[in-house]
């Protein structure tokens, strides 16, 4: 019997790791990856950090260049897909070529959620999703330039740190009452707000742009009535899933391709993962996790499901953020207001713990990354703790 053909659509973390996972799990059939980017699939996290700060930055490939040939994966870079061919099982390219598939994995990622008021500025307005975006930003983030960043989420704050380190004068505008409101607990939000302010970043909370004038500088009038002048304007206010091909194929979508716990779409032969995917939970709610690790996890899950193998057990959600000299790592459940702190954040070394009835369900480390491994095990096992012992620095964590 002829082995099936699997096609991967996308050129990022989830796409590359799906190819790797399929081969690692024993798939020997024909395997293709189609991407609209010219580069080999590359790591996205460095775009807001090392790609802006290093003297001679280089893209970091997810997999070495030789891996693709050695593992007989056919790379099709810089191509545009016209249709997925859900009914015909024939992927069609803009140049007219068609490629048969038996199973499909979609990992087309996401674009920056548009902000029309700023998009009207054209090339004077920036977002950050791809290598080309980072290259353009690197050129304009020059010392003494005035930079306005709209959005104080993870990307916004990382960009604020990088721009400040490049000598720019940075102002951040945030509609909410805090920074990193979606994915950091209150004490970490407080720490990051102070950290950026101490670095010279002006952060304007509970505010938004009402009017923009494009002249020698960009003039931005805020809801508060204040007018800012900027040489560079950047925004990051969320994502818009690149799900157009899926919508045209009549797959279920909701600002993302709706998948189940096996990364399967409403079509049993089509799977999706990474930022383009949104998971329907058992209670019917939709949930998206935008992180490097989630892209890896969903790639592995989809590969297992496509091959009819048991699904891997998911670890607690984890992501990291580098801002200035700080490395913050977030693991587990970030919800809840009753967080404990081990150490002193003012020394830039601390761990915040989230206990629920004595059970550790989440944590954030500040320049204590080596502690993530035991913390991950404790969260997975549902380990209980005495709060006093957990926050006592005289007691080594590994002894608890």
Curated annotation (Swiss-Prot):
Enzyme class: oxidoreductase
Needed co-factor(s): FAD
Pathway info: Aromatic compound metabolism; 3-phenylpropanoate degradation
A Gene Ontology cellular-component term: cytoplasm
Binding site residues for NAD(+): 146-174
UniProt keyword annotations, A-Z: Aromatic hydrocarbons catabolism, FAD, Flavoprotein, NAD, Oxidoreductase
BP GO annotations: 3-phenylpropionate catabolic process
Binding positions for FAD per the UniProt entry: 5-36
UniProt catalytic activity: 2 reduced [2Fe-2S]-[ferredoxin] + NAD(+) + H(+) = 2 oxidized [2Fe-2S]-[ferredoxin] + NADH
Enzyme Commission number(s) of this protein: 1.18.1.3
Function comment: Part of the multicomponent 3-phenylpropionate dioxygenase, that converts 3-phenylpropionic acid (PP) and cinnamic acid (CI) into 3-phenylpropionate-dihydrodiol (PP-dihydrodiol) and cinnamic acid-dihydrodiol (CI-dihydrodiol), respectively.
Family to which this protein belongs: Belongs to the bacterial ring-hydroxylating dioxygenase ferredoxin reductase family.
The protein, known as: 3-phenylpropionate/cinnamic acid dioxygenase ferredoxin--NAD(+) reductase component
Organism: Escherichia coli (strain SMS-3-5 / SECEC)
Source taxonomy: Bacteria, Pseudomonadati, Pseudomonadota, Gammaproteobacteria, Enterobacterales
